[in-house]
Amino acid sequence: MNLINTLKALLQVTPKSDIRYYLNGIQVIRNGNEVVFNSTDGLMLLQVKTTDLEYLDIQDGVQFIICRKSLDVMIKSFTKNNTPVLRCDDDFKVTLGDLPLVTIDGHYPDVYRVIRESSERCDVIGVNYTLLAKLSKACATITNTKHTCGKLKVRGATDSILFENSYDDYSFIALLMPARI
C-alpha cells in the first residue's frame, strides 16, 4: 500500500468545511495487525484497511482524526519516492514524517452502521453521477491505476451502494448513498 496515494484518495472524499467539524478529517484506527482509515462526507464513504505497517507507527487500540487542512499542506511536501511514516506517539502527537499534524477532538461517525452485509435485492436505485465519478477517482488513486475494478453490492433503493476491493496487503470499501429521484 502506498501511504501517500491512500491519504490523497481519502482526502478526495473528506469535506473541507462541513458544519459537522469531525467530518473534516480522516479517522485512523489501529486494531491489532491492521490499520483502518475512514473518510466520509455523509453521502460518500471510503474505508481503507491495511496490514502493511511499514510506514505506520501507531500503537494498538489508538484512534484519532487527522484534520484535513493540516494534511493538505503536509502531503504536498512528499513524493512517491519519499514516503514518510505516519506516527502517533505516547502523548497522542501525530506526525507525518517530521511534520506535526493537527488532530480533531470529536467522535467520528460509526461507519459500520452503513457498511453492513445484507441479501436484500432492489430493482431501481438513484445514483448521483458526480459523486460516483468523484468516488471512482478516489479508488483509482488508491490502486494507482485508471482501470480499477471491484465488487458492487446494492442492498436496497434507500440503502448504500457498496464497492469492495481486496488485494494482498490492503483492502478498501467505497460507499455511495442513493440519490432521491
Predicted regions and their residues:
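DNA polymerase processivity clamps
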Residues: 1-181
